[in-house]
Amino acid sequence: MATYISVFYSKFALLDKTNLANIKIMAQEDVFKKLVSHCKEYGFVFPSSEIYDGLGAVYDYGQYGVELKNNIKKYWWDSMTLLHENVVGIDSAIFMHPTIWKASGHVDAFNDPLIDNKDSKKRYRADVLIEDHLAKIEEKINKEVAKAAKKFGDAFDEAKFRETNPRVLEHQAKWNEIHARYSKDMNDSNFEDLRQLILDCEIVCPISGTRNWTDVRQFNLMFSTEMGSTADGAMKVYLRPETAQGIFVNFLNVQKTGRMKVPFGIAQIGKAFRNEIVARQFIFRMREFEQMEMQFFVKPGTELDWFKSWKATRLKWHKALGFGDDHYRYHDHDKLAHYANAATDIEFLMPFGFKEVEGIHSRTNFDLSQHEKFSGKNIKYFDPETNESYTPYVIETSIGVDRMFLSIMSASYCEETLDSGESRVVLKLPAALAPVKLAVMPLVKKDGLPEKAREIIDNLKFHFHCQYDEKDSIGKRYRRQDEIGTPLCITVDFQTVGDDKVEADNC
């Protein structure tokens, strides 16, 4: 059937100047609470094991959540492996030889600095307490700027205001002092002064409200288990804390079988596990999560140029989703991981502030060199153009799928107030990522309209994720599609049966 679709853009298609006034302005905390509630109510994310009262920081993705998540992964995978001829994929095992994690440094160095409040008996990451304190100072600065911008309007010079306003300068000096000391303590693993910094900043426990803190100590984040038939003969293995090492140990396998020449990349999507003590903010920080990582192997001496190149490429990829430049920023690292000589984060404006969604790192040749040392195998690359062997340097791009999911949901969530005063939720997801691409709805459940709607579904379901809906009024059905982010709805009416034309609407 050749169906002609005439498209009428609804007033809810875009957030333009005519309907911005109808958007309900909410505090960011309220937005986040409503978003979490919406995710559960409409089948995006559920607490795991909920009938058993759940399991901390573990979540399940519902029928629409899994579709959105799969679309995010496909969007990333295709951009890596289809748009770049020199990037290929791999799927390595979660369980790997335990010596891999010794070589990578995870056994000895994959730790978080923890501190307990003696009154509440609650445990916190010391670095997170300080970072939250810094964020509060930054928020004070931003409030001063926003207040001045409102007062002076178009004549407001933000840069000059930040350089001259006494209150802003006072807050900024305090921020700089704390941040410099914090960075030094973390770099030097000076946990005694890290605790003293928490005391000097008068940081209190959110539960007890007291400053009765223990000493700071290290806690390894890897989950371990045993592999083998008996306790005596079992081997201690780990649930991988990252997907990158599976790429590194397969470097030569992929390079030789794929006849790859440096520079080239290996991409992977997979689950990782970290025993986070302070897991929080819904799916932003979980103990079981999914990563999208690409390791790009380059000739030594070229790594910083490639780092800059991938840094720019990855930001463009994020901005292509259309949420606006003001939602993104770079955060260059003061403290570098033991394997890196350059690192930056792409941060996204979440309801709880700017947070990392992707990390780009120049990992040097640390990982390949370590695996060569611990395995005793030669993992060097022979360059046929220069007739030399060397250990490639690596540029890494790493995204948390769950964080990406949360960033997209938070940027897409809109609450509108209609002329009647009634409130409605519209999830303005990018069409390429929407769980359901097309909803087909007969105007009534008789006179051949349902059959015609089913015929349209049958013609389109192999190309798009479609949904048929005949329950309730046509207005309520449109609202349901708005709430799950469906970009296009087709209404089959009496005219459709006669001339094969349908009315379509951008939800």
Regions found by a protein language model. Give the residues of each.
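Short hydrophobic targeting helices and cationic amphipathic motifs
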Residues: 9-10, 20
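NTP/phosphate- and nucleic-acid-binding module
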Residues: 22-507
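Short hydrophobic alpha-helical segments enriched in small aliphatic residues
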Residues: 5-7, 13
